[in-house]
């Protein structure tokens, strides 16, 4: 008979305690379902924080990984291999704006590369260090490394890591007047923005906001950097979220769904900056390894397909309708916001701060969700989510919601 000491959870004390994972050990997955080591099934509407865009155990990704694993895993960037070269070409072609690509291992690394590229470009223009400011937006999230967490305009992620790097300025999201004022001094080299803030509460850019940011960047000869790490790769119904605003960026950062669950990141550079970094200006040991690139090529091809785009639009409407029906019954939400399959259900004031409690009850009923702060339930399921999976997820959410509202 197994005991608690036999569970992998007994080893959790070896982890640096920077996470608060649920006391569940997930063992396998298929589509939008996962099973724990006790055999219990869960419907997964979190997709590893918007990473598993094709669900779990996608056969095409497994085949690509298995085939490449039998050939070559790693060379470092002192040699060429075919998968990253082909991936770079395919990303440039798919992007509609980029000329060059830098491949790395994560979203944070992609954003670090973007920050360095901005600074290098400003330097190449003869701008002194005090005129290389990067503007970001309150509520943003750009990563955990020191420069990217400084770009992340949320004090809770920065506390205790001072002194932070200089040269960043924060303004309120969707506030054009505030951005105009922040750029008026002529010291801004770039504006870095998420088309939809993820960790900031699933908050979309207001209609026309990205176009105004682009215009201000043009006016002040500043770069536009779009962080599409969470909202990109088909999640909003188009391969890139900014396509829906018809703006052309100078730099785009990607990760998460690009690898379908295998770690990879990418920075895409447009013509204005594509030649800025030359030999030795930046680098990575593992970035663009043939194993990750082989998987990402297949993920990109599938995520860019019309079938995925159509499914995202259809399931987004169905998920919204399901959440609205729940709200009509239980009065839990003040607002449903977001685009595509990146939706946030904002809790009504009387339920403020209870997102975590609702997630606990959802897990009890076999549903895996995320929160985006204490007041928002975040839905970022696989983009190939089926009708049956969504219906099952909504049914489980209804059970969790009913139990929540019945509590004294």
UniProtKB/Swiss-Prot annotation:
Q: Which residues bind N(2)-acetyl-L-ornithine?
A: 144, 284
- Could you give a single Gene Ontology term from the biological process aspect? L-arginine biosynthetic process
Catalytic activities: N(2)-acetyl-L-ornithine + 2-oxoglutarate = N-acetyl-L-glutamate 5-semialdehyde + L-glutamate
Compartments, as annotated in UniProt: Cytoplasm
CDD domains registered for this protein in UniProt: OAT_like
Q: What EC number(s) would the UniProt record show?
A: 2.6.1.11
Annotated residues for binding of pyridoxal 5'-phosphate: 107-108, 141, 227-230, 285
Q: What class of enzyme is it?
A: transferase
This protein's major location comes to cytoplasm
Q: Which UniProt keywords apply?
A: Amino-acid biosynthesis, Aminotransferase, Arginine biosynthesis, Cytoplasm, Pyridoxal phosphate, Transferase
Q: Name one GO molecular function term.
A: N2-acetyl-L-ornithine:2-oxoglutarate 5-aminotransferase activity
- Known cofactor(s): pyridoxal 5'-phosphate
NCBIfam families given in the database record: argD, PRK01278.1, PRK04612.1
| Name of the protein in its database record | Acetylornithine aminotransferase
Give the originating organism.
Xanthomonas axonopodis pv. citri (strain 306)
């Amino acid at each position: 008979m197994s005991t608690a000491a036999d569970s992998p959870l007994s080893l959790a004390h070896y982890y640096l305690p920077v996470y608060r994972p649920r006391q569940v050990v997930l063992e396998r997955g298929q589509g939008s379902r996962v099973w724990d080591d006790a055999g219990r099934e869960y419907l997964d509407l979190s997709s590893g924080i918007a990473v598993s865009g094709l669900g779990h155990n996608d056969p095409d990704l497994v085949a690509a990984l298995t085939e490449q694993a039998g050939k070559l895993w790693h060379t470092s960037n002192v040699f060429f291999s075919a998968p990253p070269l082909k991936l770079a070409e395919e990303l440039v072609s798919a992007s509609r704006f980029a000329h060059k690509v830098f491949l790395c291992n994560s979203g944070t690394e992609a954003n670090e590369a973007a920050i360095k590229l901005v600074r290098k470009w400003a330097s190449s223009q003869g701008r002194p260090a005090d005129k290389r400011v990067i503007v970001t937006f309150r509520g943003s999230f750009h990563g955990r490394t020191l420069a990217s967490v400084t770009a992340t305009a949320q004090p809770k992620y920065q506390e205790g890591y001072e002194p932070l790097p200089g040269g960043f300025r924060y303004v309120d999201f969707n506030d054009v007047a505030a951005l105009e004022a922040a750029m008026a001094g002529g010291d801004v080299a770039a504006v870095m923005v998420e088309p939809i803030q993820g960790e900031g509460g699933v908050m979309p850019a207001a209609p026309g906001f990205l176009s105004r940011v682009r215009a201000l960047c043009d006016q002040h000869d500043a770069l536009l950097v779009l962080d599409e790490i969470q909202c990109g790769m088909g999640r909003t119904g188009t391969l890139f979220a900014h396509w829906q605003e018809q703006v052309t960026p100078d730099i785009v950062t990607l990760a998460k769904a690009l690898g379908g669950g295998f770690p990879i990141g990418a920075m895409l550079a447009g013509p204005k900056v594509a030649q800025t970094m030359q030999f030795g200006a930046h680098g990575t040991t593992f970035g663009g390894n043939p194993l990750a690139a082989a998987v990402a090529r297949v993920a990109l091809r599938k995520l860019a397909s019309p079938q995925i785009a159509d499914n995202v639009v259809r399931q987004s409407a169905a998920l919204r309708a399901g959440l609205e029906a729940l709200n009509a019954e239980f009065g839990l939400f003040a607002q449903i916001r977001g685009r595509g399959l990146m939706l946030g259900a904002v809790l009504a004031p009387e339920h403020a701060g209870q997102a975590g409690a609702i997630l606990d009850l959802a897990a009890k009923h076999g549903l895996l969700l995320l929160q985006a702060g204490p007041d928002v339930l975040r839905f970022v399921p696989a983009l190939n989510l089926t009708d049956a999976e969504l219906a099952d997820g909504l049914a489980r959410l209804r059970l969790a919601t009913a139990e929540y509202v019945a509590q004294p």
